[in-house]
Amino acid sequence: MATASRKKKKVKVTPEGTVHIKASFNNIMVTITDTLGNTVSWSSAGKNGFRGSKKNTPYASQVTSEAAAKEAYDLGMRYVDVLIKGPGSGRDAAIRALQGVGLEVRSIRDITPLPHNGCRPPKRRRV
């Protein structure tokens, strides 16, 4: 016999947190965590309905950031520090979207890993 499905209880979080933005050439992923590193909300371009080459556009990045930020804002988060990783095209749009939802951005850090002459990069594209 089927039981009634329970709605997941929304837990209030601390008003401070961290936004991790990973912007690759193919996708963008936004994860919002509390001060201890526990995930509060997350979103990606694919989760928001973008497919293929549309996933790495600034607009997809904006929509993705808004979706994650709204969920975190509803749970009580107000101040965030932003960590950006990757060379993607929608890095600036993602930060503007966070501010548009109502989260106050306190600091922005670029933590893109840079090789000290490590692996050989892929060959140049010829279109």
UniProtKB/Swiss-Prot annotation:
GO cellular component, one term: ribonucleoprotein complex
Sample GO molecular function, one term: structural constituent of ribosome
Keyword Transport: no
Keywords: Ribonucleoprotein, Ribosomal protein, RNA-binding, rRNA-binding
InterPro entries: Ribosomal_uS11, Ribosomal_uS11_bac-type, Ribosomal_uS11_CS, Ribosomal_uS11_sf
GO term, biological process aspect, one: translation
Oligomeric form and interacting partners: Part of the 30S ribosomal subunit. Interacts with proteins S7 and S18. Binds to IF-3.
Listed PANTHER family: 40S RIBOSOMAL PROTEIN S14/30S RIBOSOMAL PROTEIN S11
The protein's role, per its UniProt record: Located on the platform of the 30S subunit, it bridges several disparate RNA helices of the 16S rRNA. Forms part of the Shine-Dalgarno cleft in the 70S ribosome.
Family to which the UniProt record says this protein belongs: Belongs to the universal ribosomal protein uS11 family.
Protein name as annotated: Small ribosomal subunit protein uS11
Gene: rpsK
